[in-house]
Amino acid sequence: MINISNILDLTNYAFVLFFGITAAFYFVGMHFEDNKKQYIFTILVFGCIQLIAYLLLGKQTLYTCYPLLIHLPLILLIFFVFHQSISMSIISVLTAYLLCTPRKWIGTLVSSFFGYNQDIANAAAILVTIPLLILVIKYLSPYVEKLK
């Protein structure tokens, strides 16, 4: 059934996917300006995988299987298709994963003022995604990229 909670859940998953793929690509030196087609294709394909898993398997199974459905294939994509070292492929995805945590923290903090309402947590996490991603790209990605 489609309701506001499901829409916020799906939107939050879409934003975290966008954040993770974009951050991981920047960490290996794949900047959006030079790789627009790769970004769009990757986000669309992984978004479809995520949506299908969400609809067929449910939210909890998607959350549990996320490393196998998204992280591992993204590592393999960066390594085999985009020809980055395996160590940088792993580091970029795991660093992006780690940096998704502040989104969740901020969402939880904001929702704590509203009885830990999950819809509020999702909305707050969605709202901080782009500003956080800009900070990560501008201030952190140049340092991670130097690990090559």
Predicted regions and their residues:
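Juxtamembrane segments at transmembrane-helix boundaries
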Residues: 10, 18-36, 52-148
